[in-house]
Regions:
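Enrichment for repetitive, rod-forming helical segments
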Residues: 41, 65-66
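Short, charge-rich, low-complexity interaction segments located
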Residues: 46-55, 67, 86-91
Length: 102
């Protein structure tokens, strides 16, 4: 199955690769290789990602990045890519030592 990127996903990938290359060429190349691996894996295992509450959207988390995608009849569309490392919690933590004062 063919994999396509939404405009916002493609923009994020370009910007993230440029940012990483600015700090380390190897890090930038590793990120691009990670994106290629996700595309290859989704071709073989389209339903690998977890279903999200958004209708027909799945999420695959790979090495610190979230890849949100939709499976269409003839194509898989990656609709969003984002870092999962520096993202605040969406809900309160289960950790009893969690500090609510941020």
């Amino acid at each position: 199955m063919r994999i396509v990127l939404s405009r916002s996903a493609a923009d994020y990938i370009r910007k993230e690769a440029a940012y990483l290359r600015g700090h380390s060429r190897a890090a930038g190349e590793a990120f691009v290789a990670r994106v290629k691996a996700v595309r290859r894996d989704l071709t073989a295992f389209a339903e690998a990602g977890q279903l999200l509450p958004v209708p027909s959207v799945r999420r695959l988390i790979r090495e610190g990045y979230r890849f949100d995608y939709r499976i269409r009849p003839d194509v898989i569309e990656i609709v969003a890519v984002s870092s999962s490392v520096n993202t605040p919690l969406d809900m309160p933590s289960d950790d009893p030592d969690f500090d609510y004062e941020t």
